């Protein structure tokens, strides 16, 4: 069952109104998608953060706008990099019976023997596109790296299959690898030339 999220419809999108909302701890946003035109809304910042923390980034939330109930996903959000606060959210209205596509984080699990042997673990892909009905969207996809030795690679083909969703990614794209450690360069030393021998005067002294 979708978690309820309280939103308020915004009557204006003027900059002064947006500034006022943010000063009150609210985040301006927009709802669009299934059976919904672009509707400007606002949501309490702390309530939204708590809802996502408790239910997950890809959870379905139930909202009511103009007396109409909608199921929405947190599709996109913007964060002020200096203040580290939410400044805008996009809520995607969805049909619970229709597939949607969204980003899902790839989480590495296990300990790679190659790392213990001195190799360097490099995760190239951190998120992949996944399609599923809203209630089947995974929060993360786990990729087991416990078999990786130095020089080994895991690709998108190695991501675990699941009947509830489909990973939309190019085949054989590198997700993670364990590379050999860089060899330390030996310091270059230059031998100093040996000093030339100093010869004395071979002439006999004059008496």
UniProtKB/Swiss-Prot annotation:
Residues 171-207 are annotated as: Disordered. The keyword Ribonucleoprotein applies. GO terms for molecular function: 5S rRNA binding; structural constituent of ribosome. The keyword RNA-binding applies. GO terms for cellular component: cytosolic large ribosomal subunit. It comes from the Bacteria. InterPro entries: Rbsml_bL25/Gln-tRNA_synth_N, Ribosomal_bL25/Gln-tRNA_synth, Ribosomal_bL25_b-dom, Ribosomal_bL25_C, Ribosomal_bL25_long, Ribosomal_L25_dom, Ribosomal_uL5_bac-type. Keywords: Ribonucleoprotein, Ribosomal protein, RNA-binding, rRNA-binding. Residues 196-207 have a biased composition (Basic and acidic residues). GO terms for biological process: translation. Pfam families: Ribosomal_L25p, Ribosomal_TL5_C. HAMAP family: Ribosomal_bL25_CTC. This is one of the proteins that binds to the 5S RNA in the ribosome where it forms part of the central protuberance. NCBIfam families: bL25_bact_ctc, PRK05618.2-4. Belongs to the bacterial ribosomal protein bL25 family. CTC subfamily. Part of the 50S ribosomal subunit; part of the 5S rRNA/L5/L18/L25 subcomplex. Contacts the 5S rRNA. Binds to the 5S rRNA independently of L5 and L18. This is Large ribosomal subunit protein bL25. It comes from Listeria innocua serovar 6a (strain ATCC BAA-680 / CLIP 11262).
